[in-house]
Swiss-Prot record:
<dbReference type="Pfam" id="PF09190">
    <property type="entry name" value="DALR_2"/>
</dbReference>
<dbReference type="InterPro" id="IPR014729">
    <property type="entry name" value="Rossmann-like_a/b/a_fold"/>
</dbReference>
<protein>
    <recommendedName>
        <fullName>Cysteine--tRNA ligase</fullName>
        <ecNumber>6.1.1.16</ecNumber>
    </recommendedName>
</protein>
<dbReference type="InterPro" id="IPR024909">
    <property type="entry name" value="Cys-tRNA/MSH_ligase"/>
</dbReference>
<feature type="binding site">
    <location>
        <position position="28"/>
    </location>
    <ligand>
        <name>Zn(2+)</name>
    </ligand>
</feature>
<keyword id="KW-0067">ATP-binding</keyword>
<comment type="similarity">
    <text>Belongs to the class-I aminoacyl-tRNA synthetase family.</text>
</comment>
<dbReference type="Pfam" id="PF01406">
    <property type="entry name" value="tRNA-synt_1e"/>
</dbReference>
<feature type="short sequence motif" description="'HIGH' region">
    <location>
        <begin position="30"/>
        <end position="40"/>
    </location>
</feature>
<feature type="binding site">
    <location>
        <position position="269"/>
    </location>
    <ligand>
        <name>ATP</name>
    </ligand>
</feature>
<keyword id="KW-0862">Zinc</keyword>
<keyword id="KW-0547">Nucleotide-binding</keyword>
<feature type="short sequence motif" description="'KMSKS' region">
    <location>
        <begin position="266"/>
        <end position="270"/>
    </location>
</feature>
<feature type="binding site">
    <location>
        <position position="209"/>
    </location>
    <ligand>
        <name>Zn(2+)</name>
    </ligand>
</feature>
<keyword id="KW-0648">Protein biosynthesis</keyword>
<dbReference type="GO" id="GO:0005524">
    <property type="term" value="F:ATP binding"/>
</dbReference>
<dbReference type="GO" id="GO:0006423">
    <property type="term" value="P:cysteinyl-tRNA aminoacylation"/>
</dbReference>
Length: 485
């Protein structure tokens, strides 16, 4: 039974879809005025993992993730660089798609853009005006009247009285209440604008997501996700707009991932303390970054440090090393995940993996389970049990595939991951490091030369060095294979 932590109710709840066997899910995507940083990557990886697991569990999923391609920040950046908004956003949308492909993130089923959804946005603004939830200010902007919506603050646990008393709100005489938020901004000189019944202008940020999600998924859908920073005011305002416009419940389950933190602060562009995905991938394989993100529960803060990334690199190296020399066979995972129909329902590894993931997508436990499968695989190989080793390798790749991991051939990963430093054989801090991947390969190559020259003493000496480092060698017709542990 899958249980999801619902930010709206602040507790884990059994997941019951609106329509049996089907899931409709919307996630707030990027505002495309710069490259993706690790905080954006966390949102994409987390909800990609959710989609993969839901599909693996047999659900038919419609996954929508929007692109915000008109916004104050976009306008400012385009003006700063002296280029059109379209040129700026097109470049960063392409970069976004390239980054998500690098991280093995499945593309969403639908990816609406704000600038292509004006009809739906205008229709919702019109509804809110007609129903008395919105008004036009003297400056031509249209605002949402928060005092008109009885449930405002339920998602974030805030009350209007407390917000008015405790929040610093910029004075705007066009508003009836300082907490009212803009739905439609009247056109300003030099800014892009669209025609509307209230004059030319452009949408506010919050109305974009309400209109796009309802346009793609209907007025009531299963899951809405995004970063923790969006819970208030963005998602709070989405609920207010959407439920006022439709008269019914908007979303059943709200999911929010925690911040990525750098030097004890939230990683963000506004603070200037961020690493782009591309900067990280200059030093680490994409699957290492993905493993790093999944190594913390999605609701917990994720501390970005080199040590944590190196630990993830070591873990991925051990997983791939265990798979070296084993033919891929028929994995039970596909690009869409695996179906439990194709697994042995009594397999204890599968049962425990599912138990972890059913507990609000507990990826740290799921990754620990992958490493238990790795240990079992290494033991089978050491015992010469080829059949069991093959079966465990297929299982390891299949379960890893649900997390978006182990998609490469082992030799390709080990080559591409650029293992240039000593890789610790354990995540525990302070333990002695062992030979690097390149160092092991060099010793194996030296031993191969010694064996060709029938210098058995030298070959045995090198085997002994490797054995002391926990490296097991396996001489085959195709060459010498090695693995840790």
């Amino acid at each position: 039974m899958l249980r999801i932590y619902n930010s709206l109710t602040r507790r884990k709840e059994e997941f019951i879809p609106i329509e049996s066997g089907k899931v409709r899910m919307y996630v707030c995507g990027m505002t495309v005025y710069d490259l993706c940083h690790v905080g954006h990557a966390r949102v994409m990886v987390v909800f990609d993992m959710v989609v993969r697991y839901l599909r693996a569990s047999g659900f038919e999923v419609i996954y929508v993730r929007n692109i915000t391609d008109i916004d104050d920040k976009i306008i400012h950046r385009a003006n700063e660089r002296g280029e059109s908004i379209h040129t700026l956003t097109a470049r960063y949308i392409q970069a976004l798609h390239e980054d998500e492909a690098s991280l093995q993130i499945l593309p969403p089923d639908r990816e609406p853009r704000a600038t292509e959804s004006m009809e739906a946005i205008l229709a919702m603004v019109r509804q809110l005006l007609d129903q008395g939830y919105a008004y036009q200010g003297e400056n031509g902007d249209i605002y949402y009247d928060v005092s008109h919506f009885e449930g405002y603050g339920a998602l974030s646990g805030r009350h209007l009285e407390d917000l008015r008393a405790g929040e610093r709100v910029q004075v705007n005489e066009a508003k009836t209440d300082p907490l009212d938020f803009v739905l439609w901004k009247a056109a300003k000189s030099g800014e892009p604008a669209w025609e509307s019944p209230w004059g030319p202008g452009r949408p506010g940020w919050h109305i974009e997501c309400s209109a796009m999600s309802i346009q793609e998924l209907g007025t009531h859908f299963d899951i809405h996700g995004g970063g923790q920073d969006l819970q208030f005011p963005h998602h709070e305002n989405e609920i207010a707009q959407s439920e006022a416009a439709t008269g019914g419940k908007f979303v059943n389950y709200w999911m929010h991932n925690g911040f990525v933190r750098l030097n004890d602060e939230k990683m963000s562009k506004s603070l200037g303390n961020f690493f782009t995905v591309r900067e990280v991938l200059e030093h680490y394989h994409p699957e290492v970054l993905r493993y790093f993100i999944l190594s913390s529960h999605y609701r917990s803060p994720l501390n970005y440090t080199k040590q944590q990334l190196d630990t993830a690199k070591a873990a991925m190296t051990r997983l791939y090393t265990a798979l070296r020399g084993i033919p891929r066979g028929e994995d039970r995972a596909s690009a869409q995940g695996l179906s439990w129909e194709f697994t042995d329902g009594g397999d204890p590894f599968v049962l425990r993996f599912r138990e972890a993931m059913d507990d609000d997508f507990n990826t740290p436990e799921a990754l620990a389970l992958l490493n238990e499968v790795r240990h079992a695989l290494n033991r089978a190989r050491e015992a010469g049990d080829t059949e069991k080793g093959q079966s465990l390798a297929v299982l390891l790749r299949s379960l890893g595939g649900i997390l978006g991991l182990l998609a490469h051939e082992p030799e390709q990963f080990l080559r591409d991951s650029r293992q240039v430093a000593a890789i610790p054989d354990t995540a525990a801090a302070g333990e002695e490091a062992v030979l690097s991947h390149d160092g092991i390969e060099q010793l194996v190559a030296q031993r191969t030369v010694a064996r060709k020259n029938k210098d058995w003493a030298e070959a045995d000496r090198i085997r002994g060095i490797l054995k002391d480092q926990g490296i097991t060698l396996e001489d085959t017709a195709a060459g010498t294979l090695w693995r840790r542990g």
